[in-house]
């Protein structure tokens, strides 16, 4: 996958039209004609509107507040959520994935995961519950990012390097990987570790700050083996 350049992300956010998207369910007669910028599912005196608050608000001025319901979860948002309908991956309810994220085949995104703009998730990699992938974080193939783990994001400054996690890596629950750190292929990061330096391939690190405690051996491989069946679609 091609890495999304930081400056491109900055330009995308800076130049995007900021949106306060709302859904409005109403009864009665609206004040004025519904503009084409609004999705309109209405009959003569009842309907549902989808659009930007600045476009919809004037239409409600003639209604009693008891006659409409506004649903809204963002204000002046610069980045929409990713359209996930056709992604060849398992994405569970409650995951928050912003636009400009790349998700490879057979990846798994669990409930409550938060994945920011520019992040990349490799083939058959699992992002567990509540994990956070910051801007531009890159995870390779067949890895596991544990529940509550954080891969720190780097969008600004534009010259900063993102977190990069290799293939076949296991990152334990609630571990934190600091900006710019690289995790080598086949490494294991212990639960709760705070990783401030690069991790060599095929090593185990743990602690705060994380330090190498041993090389990967057969016993470790057996204890940390990932299950392919969880990644099948």
From Swiss-Prot:
Keyword Acyltransferase: yes
EC identifiers of the protein: 2.3.1.89
Entry keyword Transferase: yes
Listed GO MF terms: tetrahydrodipicolinate N-acetyltransferase activity
Protein's pathway: Amino-acid biosynthesis; L-lysine biosynthesis via DAP pathway; LL-2,6-diaminopimelate from (S)-tetrahydrodipicolinate (acetylase route): step 1/3
Family: Belongs to the transferase hexapeptide repeat family. DapH subfamily.
UniProt protein name: 2,3,4,5-tetrahydropyridine-2,6-dicarboxylate N-acetyltransferase
Lineage: Bacteria, Bacillati, Bacillota, Bacilli, Lactobacillales
